[in-house]
Amino acid sequence: MKNRSLILTLFLTLVIGCSRLPKEFAWSDYKGTYVGNNSAVGAILNELPAHEYLEDFSLKTDQPPYEMTIRYKNFQQTKAEIGKEEARMVSAKTALKGNAILLFALIENVEGIHFKLQGQEEVSFNREELTKEFGDLESVVQDESSMQQPFKAIE
């Protein structure tokens, strides 16, 4: 009887443990995020190209226009890899602009994004200028393939 109880307990532990595997990151879960959602913004930043150089970020949410400042260690190139698309090396300039496009597409109410790289001048983008240059930014986040486009179009 004890053996059956032990086997049943082990089996249930295994089944429950396997059903709690970490959820794969899904970009669609973050569409429509607001700049005030610190956790969601952090999750997005940790998936974008150059995330390995990310130091910290801050959000300006006290009054419009809402903005964010993202600080990176200095880098010259990084891998641009979104989902299962083939990774490609891109310059820091391309990575920052592509990241800004994706952030504007995912975060509804952010109007300005400022990137600070150690030892470099701040690089800033606003929603209006990138929309004029690239059109409807929300179309960029339709699927993983379209999310690679900002990094291909800029180089």
PLM segments and residue spans:
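N-proximal, solvent-exposed amphipathic alpha-helical segments enriched in charged/polar residues
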Residues: S19-A80
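Generic preference for well-ordered secondary structure
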Residues: K2, F25-S28, A87, K97
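Short secondary-structure boundary micro-motifs
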Residues: M1, G42-I44, L96-N99
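Intrinsic-disorder-associated interaction segments
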Residues: K23, Y34-N37, M89, V123, ...
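Polar/charged, Gly/Pro-rich intrinsically disordered segments
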Residues: G112-E155
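Sec-dependent N-terminal signal peptides of Gram-positive bacterial secreted proteins and lipoproteins
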Residues: K2-L21
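Mature extracytoplasmic domains of secretory-pathway proteins
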Residues: E55-E121
